[in-house]
Amino acid sequence: MASQLTDAFARKFYYLRLSITDVCNFRCTYCLPDGYKPGGVTNNGFLTVDEIRRVTRAFASLGTEKVRLTGGEPSLRRDFTDIIAAVGENDAIRQIAVTTNGYRLARDAANWREAGLTGVNVSVDSLDARQFHAITGQDKFRQVMAGIDAAFDAGFEKVKVNTVLMRDVNHYQLDTFLAWIQPRPIQLRFIELMETGEGSDLFRKHHISGQVLRDELIKRGWIHQLRQRSDGPAQVFCHPDYAGEIGLIMPYEKDFCATCNRLRVSSVGKLHLCLFGDGGVSLRDLLQDDAQQYALEERISDALREKKQTHFLHQSNTGITQNLSYIGG
């Protein structure tokens, strides 16, 4: 087994975000406002179960303990349950999570849990059904809420909910969100709107700093918790009267990248060192045979030497990320 993946800035990487498709059936305003438009990749062009098995085996050998399956919408893959099971074949991987729009959660949460899934993140940008429809292009609010309930019923002890923070859209709804998580063990994560290549106008119109919410939380008696390794870049707040927690993810905050612990592999097998980095390193030619594992590990380790200390979002440099479905956010 190789040593733990570590970059030139002594950051250790134990978390892999693995995109398995860039197809999505929602049309979120900040991601795919015009809906999914196939590029050069057909469904047959995405990583196969065997390729996923090989890439996660290599990362597990390099110290990866957590894999998050992303998209697009991962559950649109008909073999999604098989993918969960394939990742779970690696004993070193202790956590297998998914980020989903919740579209199929009510139907499939129990099956995913049985296959080995340990964590669920659901995207919910508004608790108002009409506004949810306006943001996502889908009238599925009640279906997604039922999915969150189904996740708890299936045995997931905590569900994370991702909410993209947008000025004049949902930034003023903090009290509504807090009331929702008071009786529920949900970690509600407000994510600052990030600029992407296709979303510059939206960013200028709707970006608001997460510091605004942080100040409001502190006023209301919420306590900033000591950072746990599993938090990654999130600042987590708790309150003695609430079963839920609040997380703030603020990529424009000073030193945001200092706690980076994750690498990304796209749905076509490219290693990306940063969500907003350039290029990417193709791994796919080394995912065709089990005998290639050593060479695959070497390529991953060598690529990490090029990881930059920080992103360049402050200079409006969004790198290769034209939209957030591209490499899974």
Curated annotation (Swiss-Prot):
GO terms for molecular function: 4 iron, 4 sulfur cluster binding; cyclic pyranopterin monophosphate synthase activity; GTP 3',8'-cyclase activity; GTP binding; metal ion binding; S-adenosyl-L-methionine binding. The lineage of its organism: Bacteria, Pseudomonadati, Pseudomonadota, Gammaproteobacteria, Enterobacterales. This is GTP 3',8-cyclase. Residues 8-234 form the Radical SAM core domain. S-adenosyl-L-methionine binds at Y30, G72, S123, M194. GTP binds at R17, R68, T99, K160, R262, L263, R264. Belongs to the radical SAM superfamily. MoaA family. Keywords: 4Fe-4S, GTP-binding, Iron, Iron-sulfur, Lyase, Metal-binding, Molybdenum cofactor biosynthesis, Nucleotide-binding, S-adenosyl-L-methionine.
